[in-house]
Amino acid sequence: MSRFVTVGETMVALVPKEQGLLRYGPDFSMRIAGAESNTAIGLSRLGHTSSFITRIGNDGFGDFLIRMVRAEGVDTSGITVDKDHRTGVMFKEIRPNMETAVHYYRDNSAASCLCTGDVDEAVIQKADMVHLTGITPVLSKNCRQMVYDVMDMAVEGKTLISFDPNIRKKLWKDEEFRPMMKELINKSSCVMMGLEEGLFLYGTKDVKRLADMLFKGGRLRYLAVKNGAEGAWICDDQHLFHIPPW
């Protein structure tokens, strides 16, 4: 069994080899994208055993994703191949002003059909930690239920829960998911968020105040707050440390 398990969406990213608008048909290279798959890969590169649970389409893009994740030493036995839905794809566009635009083709994707039945409870409960993000629960109602169920499995098995809100307002559309995000944070053992996400969810960019709010009444053990070029903060309920940027 793996020490770390990540659960959520992965996609194929088509990245242009040079600057140019999509309408001019730039050449693309194919890469893997997705916070959860990237986390599983990063943990494996650091020498930890990791497993990735997701759902992909029965297509060439899905085959590519499995091959790339497996090549990094990640256990892919928890990946479900969906014969009825396609693998999600994203295109990046580097515009003349060097601004990057991202175009998603993920509606009704295989990953959006991920459900509790795709998750082996024993894998979650025998792991040291399970990692989830706020992207998965806004993809669909079944994804949302799956995230809650995985957290319940982890709590029952005394597995630590790592959560990154990873807020993407484009995915939220007209729905209000802030209460849900706060609820998921309260269920988590370790939380990583950006300073702007803290402001959006809790109304403050004061890290000490943010920590005071998050450590009250929940299961939280550790909080990491990122602030780009300014570095990051990490804290428990007693200590707060600033980590300078690399």
Language-model features: where?
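Structural alpha-helical scaffold elements that stabilize or flank donor/cofactor-binding regions
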Residues: 122-123, 183-184, 216
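Glycine/threonine-rich flexible loop motifs
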Residues: 136-145, 173, 201-203
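Helix C-cap/helix->beta junction micro-motif
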Residues: 46, 154-158, 187
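Structural recognition of alpha->loop->beta junctions
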Residues: 70-74, 175-200
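Conserved phosphate-binding/catalytic region of the ribokinase-like
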Residues: 3-5, 152, 156, 205-246
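Conserved N-terminal subdomain of the carbohydrate kinase-like
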Residues: 49-134, 156
